[in-house]
């Protein structure tokens, strides 16, 4: 009854003696009679001091309640209540007070603005950030398809100072470069992608070896040295020459530059002195990423004669660790000849040695790699950025956060929350996969990478960020993209959490004005990291349909609620039309 008092305004008005309409009292009586001891509670409130002077005291409510119970009248739907628009109700009064395990309850209704108002707010926030001379990290959060790309492309046409646009992938980089040309932006270039130059696999794989051990700074030098020892008649000679020339020319380019998030973090410092920086989408998971090495491979490296004693001592110390640890700083500079000898390890040795946060068990060591974020003004446009996370990992940087008001989707989302739809739920559950394949047969599917072939798709969590190929199409997003618990733990440590033994357990939580069950943590920082990562991956997947401007449908099968969805806690064979 306490829950009902908190979430049902009709019941609240009844307890406070504020109901004037007898019909509302009867509606409430039918609802309360559906609960254990509901009749007793109703009469207790009816005969309370606050209802003593009400006109409906003359009615024989005891007789009415007995008739409701005897006739087995159903609990009425909240949709038929006069208070319907004043609360975040569930199916009926009882489920509102005590929702089922798989039910998503909306605690506060979103107030939407029209699309033009939301778009104009984005324009204003962006122009304010670009006009500022302060060295701040400007985080502008706006819905997918609100017009973020066109906003900065229009700015670039007349900007006095050139800009660097950083996007998540090479594919999106090419799309933005193409769109910029269509906008009439001429003084512009894109950083090169070695995969498009046709250089032989022998060379590119050898170069990749250096990236794999964390010696990316040496990779281009290796390529230049390879060119010096290569005959001009070699088919790779002209291709490598052109690639190196393009790398050098783009780094010195005085016009606009389109690049990837990863490449941005390794551009020469001089670029940030002459260019403004715009981040298209959140760069957090490029700055911070996790990698693992098996304990067996680690122990093997400690016996390598090509590594200095200081490095082997550090690795031996890591082998003895168990659980989460914050490591002391360790400076590592290996000689060129050593790099060539250890490049076949296939382990990010530099990343491991420099890692401040690690987790070790008997099988493997997982570590957090952190790239340096350039010390200059940056303007980020993202649908999923988390202000609190940036404030925690960059406490000494000035951060300006703006969230644009939301517009209502033109398209529709139907979300099935009858199961968590976790990776574990799909393991060897061919019946479930078969059912979902049938339900998703007329849509394009985004799901886990390891089961995408089951749905005849090449779209999976982690590779759809920013793409436009699915615009206006009916989609099915299948799965709850939970990451390994160790990943959450390492991110949380970087955000200031002090971890001992922490475990997930099923619990009802509140997130973005919704109440729902999730297998999550009691620790607030861990929960913040997990919910942000889940939300951002699901919203990125849903956002590919561009529902804000496109009248299409997205069907979501996941136990974590996405925005503006109709939540359905029972899976039916026929999808909602």
Predicted regions and their residues:
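ASCE RecA-like P-loop NTPase motor cores
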Residues: 102-577
């Amino acid at each position: 009854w306490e829950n009902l008092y908190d979430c049902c305004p009709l019941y609240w008005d009844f307890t406070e003696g504020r109901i004037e309409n007898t019909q509302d009292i009867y509606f409430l009586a039918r609802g309360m009679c559906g609960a254990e001891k509901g009749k007793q509670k109703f009469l207790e409130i009816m005969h309370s001091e606050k209802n003593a002077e009400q006109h409906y005291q003359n009615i024989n409510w005891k007789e009415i309640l007995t008739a409701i119970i005897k006739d087995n009248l159903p609990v009425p739907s909240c949709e038929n209540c006069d208070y319907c628009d004043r609360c975040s109700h569930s199916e009926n009064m009882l489920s509102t007070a005590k929702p089922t395990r798989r039910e998503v309850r909306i605690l506060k209704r979103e107030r939407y603005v029209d699309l033009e108002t939301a778009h104009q707010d984005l324009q204003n926030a962006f122009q304010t950030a670009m006009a500022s001379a302060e060295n701040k990290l400007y985080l502008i959060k706006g819905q997918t398809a609100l017009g973020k790309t066109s906003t900065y492309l229009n700015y670039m046409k007349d900007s006095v100072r050139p800009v660097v646009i950083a996007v998540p992938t090479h594919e999106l980089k090419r799309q933005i470069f193409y769109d910029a040309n269509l906008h009439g932006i001429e003084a512009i270039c894109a950083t090169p992608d070695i995969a498009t130059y046709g250089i032989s696999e022998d060379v590119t794989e050898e170069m990749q070896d250096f990236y794999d051990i964390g010696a990316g700074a040496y990779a281009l030098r290796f390529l230049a040295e390879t060119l010096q020892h290569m005959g001009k008649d070699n088919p790779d000679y002209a291709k490598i020459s052109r690639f190196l020339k393009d790398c050098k020319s783009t780094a010195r380019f005085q016009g606009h530059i389109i690049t990837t998030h990863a490449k941005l973090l390794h551009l020469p410092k001089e670029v940030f002195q002459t260019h403004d920086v715009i981040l298209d989408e959140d760069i957090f998971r490029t700055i911070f990423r996790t990698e693992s090495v098996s304990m067996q491979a680690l122990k093997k490296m400690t016996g390598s004669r090509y590594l200095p004693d200081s490095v082997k001592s550090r690795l031996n110390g890591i082998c003895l660790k168990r659980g989460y640890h914050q490591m002391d700083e360790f400076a590592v500079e290996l000689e060129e000849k050593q790099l060539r000898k250890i490049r076949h390890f296939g382990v990010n040795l530099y990343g491991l040695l420099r890692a401040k946060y690690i987790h070790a068990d008997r099988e493997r060591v997982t570590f957090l790699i952190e790239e340096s974020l350039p010390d200059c003004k940056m303007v980020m446009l993202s649908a999923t950025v988390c202000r609190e996370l940036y404030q925690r990992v960059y406490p000494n940087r000035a951060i300006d956060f703006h969230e644009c008001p939301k517009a209502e989707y033109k398209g529709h989302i139907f979300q099935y929350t009858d199961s968590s739809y976790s990776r574990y739920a799909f393991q060897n559950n061919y019946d479930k996969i078969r059912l979902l394949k049938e339900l998703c047969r007329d849509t394009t599917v985004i799901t886990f990478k390891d089961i995408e072939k089951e749905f005849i798709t090449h779209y999976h969590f982690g590779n759809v960020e920013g793409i436009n190929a699915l615009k206006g199409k009916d989609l099915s997003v299948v799965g709850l993209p939970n990451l390994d618990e160790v990943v959450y733990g390492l991110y949380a440590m970087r955000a200031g959490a002090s971890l001992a033994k922490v475990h997930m357990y099923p619990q009802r939580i509140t997130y973005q004005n919704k109440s729902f069950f999730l297998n999550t943590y009691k620790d607030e920082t861990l929960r913040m990291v997990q919910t942000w990562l889940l939300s951002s991956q699901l919203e990125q997947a849903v956002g590919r349909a561009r529902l804000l401007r496109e009248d299409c449908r997205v069907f979501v099968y996941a136990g974590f609620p996405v925005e503006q969805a109709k939540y359905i806690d029972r899976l039916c064979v026929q999808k909602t039309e």
